[in-house]
């Protein structure tokens, strides 16, 4: 069988859905230990299920849901999101500003690919959700982690953020504000 080598883009990507932490968890599970799998973002095994009214709506709409919707997401859902955020004081948002995806992974990846050019630096909090670092790296960015200290209720260390900003860190328009 022919073997395919992995892309060099993966050299600096560590995302523990399939990495060493996952392998260790599988080993411990095989040994009889109960493992809480919090690495995949799947809330259903922990009792977080869709409310009945949403399930009823899904079932009712199945006959007309066989195909793609607008690439930004369902108009009615985007409109509801705009309304919600307008009640929270975000007045300038419109339906055209809202994108809905198939979960946070798709949207994080899409955002990083849209915003980063090869060699751009991006500030990401540490500790972080590994997908941010992986998506930024695969999009050609260089991740610069800033500290969030547990002893300070996980608030970001502003001095550390400022120390990490370089000419490659922020787009020119954003850099003017720092």
Segments predicted by a language model, with ranges:
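Short glycine/proline- and acidic residue-enriched helix-loop micro-motifs
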Residues: 6-8, 176-177
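Conserved core of the PLP fold type I
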Residues: 65-178
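N-terminal small-domain helix-loop-helix segment of the aminotransferase-like
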Residues: 2-4, 11-103, 110
């Amino acid at each position: 069988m022919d073997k395919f080598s992995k892309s060099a883009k993966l050299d600096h990507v560590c995302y523990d859905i399939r990495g060493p932490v996952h392998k260790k968890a599988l080993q411990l599970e095989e040994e009889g230990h109960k493992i809480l799998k919090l690495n995949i973002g799947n809330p259903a095994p922990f009792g977080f299920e869709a409310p009945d009214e949403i399930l009823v709506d899904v079932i009712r709409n199945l006959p007309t849901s066989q195909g793609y919707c607008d690439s930004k997401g369902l108009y009615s859902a985007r409109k509801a999101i705009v309304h919600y955020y307008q009640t929270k004081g975000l007045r300038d948002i419109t339906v055209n500003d809202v994108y809905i995806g198939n979960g946070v992974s798709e949207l994080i990846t899409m955002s990083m690919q849209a915003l980063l050019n090869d060699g751009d630096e991006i500030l990401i909090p540490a500790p972080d959700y590994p997908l941010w670092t992986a998506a930024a790296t695969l999009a050609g960015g260089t991740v610069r982690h800033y500290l969030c200290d547990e002893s300070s209720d996980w608030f970001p260390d502003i001095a550390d953020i400022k120390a990490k900003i370089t000419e490659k860190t922020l787009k020119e328009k954003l850099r003017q504000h720092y």
